[in-house]
Every structure is written in C-alpha cells, then in structure tokens.
Amino acid sequence: AFVNEDEVMFMNNFADSLKWSGPDKKTNDDFDSKEDLANAINSYMKIYDDHALKNTTFYGGSVYSTDKPNSDPNTGIRVYGDWYHKHTETGKEVSHKWMALVWFNEAGKIYEFRDFFDVNGFLKQHTQ
C-alpha cells in the first residue's frame, strides 16, 4: 500500500489506538498517534515518488534478539530493509536503511510501531 501510495489501505493496517514512535523520537517511550502517522505518511507521499522497500528481512517471535524460544503471541516482529525514493520536485534518488519494531493485536492490526532511520543522513542526500 505504501509503495502504491494508497494511504487509506496503508493506514488500515494500524489500530485506532496506535502508539507510533517515529525516527525523530529521542526515547523509546515517546509516542505519537495514528493521526500523527497518517499526517507524516501524507507529507512523505507528497514529497517522494517511486517508493521501493528492498532487501527486507523479518524476524518473528521477539522484537529483541534472543536465543531463547518464545511462544508468546504478543512479542511482535522486527523488520529491516532499504527504502528507495525519488524526490518529486528534483528527481533526486535517495535511500536509507530502515528498521521497525511492530506489535499486532488480536484483530491483526498494528497497535505499536517504532521505526528507525538516520533522518539527518537521509536529508543530507538531497544536497549531495
């Protein structure tokens, strides 16, 4: 949905009670709402085109690295990948490494979402 810039479909993956900690947050207990994420996604889609998430890796069973087996269904997943985009106005191609911690509720909706990437490094590409 994100790659196709379908904001409605993308946001349908998130619970109304979503707690989102974006890459601009300084601590893991600083959250924004689903509405804040929707506004951020809307802005992002206006600024960039040709989105692609490549080299993805998913780790289930725990959001934190562990060698112990875990059967708790509420432990979430870790997602890693490389995002590629094209700046709408300049046509400049930009990319960044990305990582997310994602937890799902019983309805299959994401109720907590923490995503991480180097915002300053990403923005610096626009001037190089």
What is the role of each PLM region?
Residues 109-128:
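Low-complexity, intrinsically disordered terminal/linker segments enriched in charged
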